[in-house]
Amino acid sequence: MMNEKQRLQYTAQIETDHPTDKKSALDENLQRLKQKTSQDYEKYFSTVFVPPSLKEAKKRGKEEVKYHKDFSIPEEFRGMGNGRKFYIRTYGCQMNEHDTEVMAGIFMALGYEPTDRPEDANVILLNTCAIRENAENKVFGEIGHLKPLKQNNPDLLLGVCGCMSQEESVVNKILKQFQYVDMIFGTHNIHRLPYILKEAYMSKEMVVEVWSKEGDVIENLPKVRKGNIKAWVNIMYGCDKFCTYCIVPYTRGKERSRRPEDIIQEVRHLAAQGYKEITLLGQNVNAYGKDFTDMKYGLGDLMDELRKIDIPRIRFTTSHPRDFDDRLIEVLAKGGNLVEHIHLPVQSGSSEVLKMMARKYTREQYLELVRKIKEAIPGVALTTDIIVGFPNETDEQFEETLSLYREVEFDSAFTFIYSPREGTPAAKMVDNVPMEVKKERLQRLNALVNEISAKKMKEYEGQVVEVLVEGESKNNPDVLAGYTRKNKLVNFVGPKSAIGQLVNVRITEAKTWTLNGEMVEETIEVK
């Protein structure tokens, strides 16, 4: 990843380090970039790109899901990347992180080498997130910062991919304001990367490929995973819930599940490679299997099979309360390698606000689900997502969110101020909660989140917990860091040989968000 200091350094270097004999090459490149505006992009979009439409998107459920299991790099593309390097900057969720692993796998299969320095790259991709406006602004800022690098190197390919690429307004902005971008491709087009690269090398125009059949599942894509301790495994793609504030159903497409045999095979392969923890991924992971027409098979059934595989820990994210059924609770209660941590976004504690959000459950239904989970899985760690300042949210409705948080006693929460997303139903609502009120509500909510987290963490003092050691602490290389089954970060002093292993740690100090401890050698019952 490139931090602000590094960005400024290489931008300054680009602007000052070039001798005058390069001026003609720079001018020639700028002229080439300007020529890109000649194409009639408005006409292009009117014929091949369909903007987000709630009415049209909801019709897509009838489309058959097709499975393609024969992905391979065509011979004509092999060696394309010989002598070239790639750099991918990733924004957003674990799905994007996993998509980056797939793109890195494709790049390396083409012969490219990875680099963590954008100035050394021949291809730069920004894998983007569209969940909030702030995330998009960061990407536009990054595209601007990369302009000097692009001007200096006419052969550099600069691409924007991921969720932002699926939004017409974003693509139009790039076409009009950032003509030096060479490629724009969407979340459904990752498997087309070799073809997109080839066209970008050969074309003088921007390559835009954001439309495709979204009802397919592509198997056997190459991956370059980060590390060899924890791995992500996609089990489904897309979302059909259409919460009024959310852009994901438009950027990620319809819900479509991978076949269980393909998932089981992938997890077995990871277990054989020595991975210690698997996280099953999906925009709405517990809707898994609802699109199958040939069998009744859900996330609970899949987890029941995966728990028999010899891998220490299995997690999943993100779940929707609406699809969290009794079968899944029953299987999770079996324990073993199924961890006692569930991320269960509530978004609001008010039934009225939940109705405006189209979450399709009430406060009471959510609390009943929590009761069943806690009864079946004693000591379970529940975490959540909460939005404050949704249109028309009153003070009383916000108080309901605070009271629900106190009642559930979540271990932690991701909290956000409402951000309207163009193309969603909520964007048409009047955003009538003043920003100062939103900020005050967020501050009050975060104070409660911190208070309960500190209280729950304090209970760990004196306990011995199982920790999967991931590496050195970011703040101190002499300290090791890892996570418990309930996803608590633990820092402790121990030998480097413990990295990648499951060890027992006695907690000596609890902080609001982290635990400090000491490694114990003796066999002891852990929490």
UniProtKB/Swiss-Prot annotation:
GO MF terms, alphabetically ordered: 4 iron, 4 sulfur cluster binding; metal ion binding; N6-isopentenyladenosine methylthiotransferase activity
Function: Catalyzes the methylthiolation of N6-(dimethylallyl)adenosine (i(6)A), leading to the formation of 2-methylthio-N6-(dimethylallyl)adenosine (ms(2)i(6)A) at position 37 in tRNAs that read codons beginning with uridine.
All copies of domain Radical SAM core, residue ranges: 225-455
Residue positions binding [4Fe-4S] cluster 2: 239, 243, 246
UniProt biased composition (Basic and acidic residues): 15-27
Lineage: Bacteria, Bacillati, Bacillota, Bacilli, Bacillales
Keyword annotations from UniProtKB, A to Z: 4Fe-4S, Cytoplasm, Iron, Iron-sulfur, Metal-binding, S-adenosyl-L-methionine, Transferase, tRNA processing
Quaternary context: Monomer.
Domain of life the protein comes from: Bacteria
Gene expressing this chain: miaB
Annotated family: Belongs to the methylthiotransferase family. MiaB subfamily.
Organism (species): Anoxybacillus flavithermus (strain DSM 21510 / WK1)
TRAM domain location: 458-521
Pfam families documented for this protein: Radical_SAM (PF04055), TRAM (PF01938), UPF0004 (PF00919)
Listed GO CC annotations: cytosol
Subcellular location: Cytoplasm
Residue ranges of the region described as Disordered: 1-27
Protein name: tRNA-2-methylthio-N(6)-dimethylallyladenosine synthase
Chain residues that bind [4Fe-4S] cluster 1: 93, 129, 163
SMART domains reported for this sequence: Elp3
